[in-house]
Amino acid sequence: MENENKILIIRVIRSFEYRTIKNLILKDIDLNTNVSDFKKLVADKIQTTPGFTPFKTKQYDSMKIFFVPHGQKPNNLTINIENDHFFLNNNKSLAENGVVYETEISFFVMEDYLKYKENPENKW
């Protein structure tokens, strides 16, 4: 049976308007992990990984697939606002949500996302 542990790229988004984004590379992630448990893991990594000091103050609560390997990248460089079906369901595993090896997942605050989606304007 194929090993289910994969590398995932998490795009931690502090600000949509200013494109304040930092990538967190996670290795050996079991794709059968529940999304709610995965969010806790990522939040813990943000608190303990060097270089994420400006990102520690936000309470990130949502995940959405930004890019699936061998797929088309979205036009918006901050987040994939075209495909709302890419939100990760907390009650399903990563694999059940369509996450595969080297998937890029955005991690952000939903309230900030909704404001940005109404007016996707960059301020820089």
Swiss-Prot record:
Coiled-coil residues: none
InterPro entries, per the entry: UPF0538
Domain of life: Eukaryota
Entry similarity comment: Belongs to the UPF0538 family.
UniProt protein name: UPF0538 protein
